[in-house]
């Protein structure tokens, strides 16, 4: 073996040994790998992150609903301003009415707050948005009180939901065989939740009649614990019901003009002018 070949082998061996030494030293000096997330604190942190993601998704859905409400209200006010004589026999909508303007302002402020929650990039921004939404001095509080009272009102919510619930078994019996498995399961879940909502209404005492205008302009009266619990249960059930999309048109009729079903199976405004016209006809 020549001296040159021997030297090459020696150099290569030294390089390999140096690399192995560097690797070994690196394993000793490297930052330790993080431990598995098994402690209670880490589990709480993980759950908080999941809760924030869920809340942000809900805020985005809520913001979409508010945008539709604002669009419809603006279209109605624009239409009333352009042709105040239209809709004779009904209470005309005054585009300069202080209460209507206050409602629009509250809706837009509520949209801004929900946007802060939905688009928060860190936990601090997320909590700040939530604090703004639930502040007792929030200008949206009267509007939110109106929504809460309306949702909890047996007179407003119960009759149409009860009618759908009562007619659902016959619909499933007549049409169940022709539905795909996913749609049939969704309708069955919808029927189940509707039953829970109706039961909740039926076991509650009669609630005071809701006056939307008064509720939107005055602080809500102090609610008793039973009413608060009633609303919380209804709120959760209504959110769950929404997850199963629009009921069969055979039970509720086709969507009004100007509306269409979105990718999640829920109704949304597609044409504000047509939707406003449909609302005025109902």
From Swiss-Prot:
Mainly localized where? Answer: other
Lipidated positions (S-farnesyl cysteine) are 279
Residues with Cysteine methyl ester modification: 279
Instruction: Show the segment(s) annotated as Disordered.
Output: 73-95
* Cellular location(s): Peroxisome
GO biological process annotation, one example: protein import into peroxisome membrane
Example of a GO MF term: peroxisome membrane targeting sequence binding
Which stretches are tagged as propeptide in the UniProt entry? 280-282
Gene Ontology cellular-component annotations:
peroxisomal membrane
UniProt keyword terms in alphabetical order? Lipoprotein, Methylation, Peroxisome, Prenylation
What family is reported?
A: Belongs to the peroxin-19 family.
Protein name listed in UniProt: Putative peroxisomal biogenesis factor 19
Organism lineage reads as:
Eukaryota, Metazoa, Ecdysozoa, Nematoda, Chromadorea
What gene is it encoded by? prx-19
């Amino acid at each position: 073996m020549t001296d040159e070949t021997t030297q090459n082998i020696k150099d290569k061996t030294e390089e390999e040994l140096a690399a192995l030494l560097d690797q070994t030293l690196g394993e000793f000096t490297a930052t330790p790998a993080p431990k598995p997330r098994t402690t209670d604190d880490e589990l709480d942190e993980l759950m908080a992150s999941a809760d924030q993601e869920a809340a942000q998704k809900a805020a985005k859905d809520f913001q979409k609903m508010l945008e539709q409400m604002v669009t419809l209200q603006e279209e109605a006010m624009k239409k009333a301003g352009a042709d105040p004589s239209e809709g004779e026999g009904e209470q005309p909508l005054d585009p300069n009415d202080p209460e209507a303007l206050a409602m629009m302002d509250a809706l837009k402020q509520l949209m801004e707050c929900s946007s802060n929650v939905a688009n928060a990039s860190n936990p601090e921004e997320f909590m700040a948005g939530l604090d703004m939404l639930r502040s007792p001095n929030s200008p949206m509080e009267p509007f939110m009180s109106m929504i809460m009272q309306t949702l909890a009102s047996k007179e407003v919510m119960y009759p149409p939901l009860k009618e759908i619930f009562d007619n659902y078994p016959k619909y499933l019996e007549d049409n169940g065989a022709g539905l795909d498995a996913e749609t049939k399961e969704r309708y069955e879940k919808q029927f189940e939740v509707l039953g829970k909502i109706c039961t909740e209404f039926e076991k509650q005492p009669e609630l005071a009649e809701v006056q939307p205008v008064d509720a939107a302009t005055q602080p809500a009266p102090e609610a008793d614990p039973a009413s608060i619990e009633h609303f919380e249960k209804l709120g959760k059930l209504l959110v769950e019901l929404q997850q199963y999309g629009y009921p069969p048109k055979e039970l509720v009729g086709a969507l009004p003009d100007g509306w269409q079903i979105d990718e999640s199976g829920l109704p949304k405004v597609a044409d504000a002018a047509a939707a406003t016209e449909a609302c005025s006809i109902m």
